[in-house]
């Protein structure tokens, strides 16, 4: 029997994502000049104000206020009428030194035996329903907002009224084998200028109706066609005439961003991962250096699941890994192929083979995925998974105010670099 499944995403201008991006930008600045930095940075944003807090152990000096303002400007909060803008917002920092009690459980003279930064369980997931091995619902939700932001930032934008805050939600019908067969509903809520105002000849209700009609038309005729072009024909065909499209269902979305809602680091953990299709251990990613297994082990688990599915071991795979604080080896590795395995092994036996192929000690993960590099700001909006790995030039400022250019490799956990090893281990051709 067919069923409906829904995932959501939020834009880079959503207040929680503003917080995530500031936290990760500060993390990157520390790692750029001291790769051994231990960082846990939390951000709160609200009307006209940014509050930074957290714990750091580093040889670097970072101008956290300047870093936060740069992020806010890049996102697009540059006008005072937004109630939150890069030039006038106040920034308060209460970042302090990391607890020695935590650090003693992590650092080791033999770095390969570095302990996990905390206890907990982390999950990785992959499915072959899309080219990037992500659930289509969340992949489409991300692409809708990524393209909407791109339209907003165009010099001669066809949607010049757009503001930074936005949300999307996608509902897809799946057949009884879990394959997407039809897009049922798309919801887009996007912040906008008040580009039609009540006057002598136009009531407030009429002005609101005119704005909503224009935005709905532009989403349907500008945004949706651009997003369809990103996909192969078989997925683009799921956008049929029966799709229900809701645009700004409340009728108006002028007040938004941190002025409309307070934002906090780590409040969009389902958007950051698999859109609700897979389990989540509860630990957020942003603002955390890779000694925190909440982040590094979740990336490693995704790397495993994606390579296993790409190798043909299963059509779908969930991987759980769990740690004790201060202990290097994980206490457990669990696999669930949801009954869609292509090998004559139990899920427990598959997990044993994973242990042979992948070293899941924290330091080994850091080295394998190059996680001690300043690579995190780019992850903090539009999902940490399903992104294309690439090299980028990034500029950082050292403690002397000198700019440094770095080439870094982003989204290394999305590489399909273990497929051959997996096929050899499982005897797959």
From Swiss-Prot:
Pathway: Amino-acid biosynthesis; S-adenosyl-L-methionine biosynthesis; S-adenosyl-L-methionine from L-methionine: step 1/1. GO terms for cellular component: cytoplasm. InterPro entries: ADOMET_SYNTHASE_CS, S-AdoMet_synt_C, S-AdoMet_synt_central, S-AdoMet_synt_N, S-AdoMet_synthetase, S-AdoMet_synthetase_sfam. Its EC number is 2.5.1.6. GO terms for biological process: one-carbon metabolic process; S-adenosylmethionine biosynthetic process. Residues 98-108 are annotated as: Flexible loop. Its cofactor is Mg(2+); K(+). Mg(2+) binds at residue 16. ATP binds at residues 14, 165-167, 252-253, 261, 267-268, 284, 288. The keyword Cell inner membrane does not apply. GO terms for molecular function: ATP binding; magnesium ion binding; methionine adenosyltransferase activity. L-methionine binds at residues 55, 98, 261, 292. Keywords: ATP-binding, Cytoplasm, Magnesium, Metal-binding, Nucleotide-binding, One-carbon metabolism, Potassium, Transferase. K(+) binds at residue 42. It catalyses: L-methionine + ATP + H2O = S-adenosyl-L-methionine + phosphate + diphosphate. It comes from the Bacteria. Catalyzes the formation of S-adenosylmethionine (AdoMet) from methionine and ATP. The overall synthetic reaction is composed of two sequential steps, AdoMet formation and the subsequent tripolyphosphate hydrolysis which occurs prior to release of AdoMet from the enzyme. Homotetramer; dimer of dimers. HAMAP family: S_AdoMet_synth1 (MF_00086). Belongs to the AdoMet synthase family. This is S-adenosylmethionine synthase. It comes from Porphyromonas gingivalis (strain ATCC BAA-308 / W83). The lineage of its organism: Bacteria, Pseudomonadati, Bacteroidota, Bacteroidia, Bacteroidales. The gene is metK.
